[in-house]
Design a protein with these regions (language model features):
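Acidic, low-complexity intrinsically disordered tails
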Residues: 98-122
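Conserved helicase C-terminal RecA-like lobe
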Residues: 1-102
């Protein structure tokens, strides 16, 4: 049984979407990690158990270290869940744990319409 990652070719100039689990052991020039909000990453109340939270922190480390040159982190200011009304989103605690000297905050062209994005410089 082949997966998309089994057919991945490093020389292809294309965006590759994958889970963090399937990215283990691979590296890419640029990595984009989306959904870095409390309740998504880390997942939620079950992640407040020390062991589960540490596992999610390790997964975040895996995701960040897949980047050879740059990593872009993004989060939403608000999110609609299960067809409901937009709810305010809180930036993931993992972003705040990164060394400040490695983080550069960038905002979109129209800050009111786009959420801030972060870049980790290597």
């Amino acid at each position: 049984l082949l997966t998309d990652i089994d057919r991945w070719n490093e020389s292809d100039e294309a965006v590759t979407l994958m889970t963090i689990h399937s990215a283990k052991g691979l590296e890419f020039p640029i990595v984009m990690i989306v959904g870095l909000e409390e309740g998504l990453f880390p997942l939620g109340p079950q992640s407040y158990e020390v062991e589960e939270l540490e596992e999610e922190r390790r997964l975040f480390y895996v995701a960040v270290t897949r980047a050879q040159q740059k990593v872009y982190l993004s989060y939403a200011n608000s999110r609609r869940r299960f067809g409901g009304h937009p709810m305010p989103a809180v930036q993931s605690r993992f972003i705040h744990e990164l060394p400040e000297e490695l983080v550069s905050v960038k905002t979109g062209i129209k800050a009111a319409e786009t959420a801030p994005s972060l870049s980790i410089l290597r």
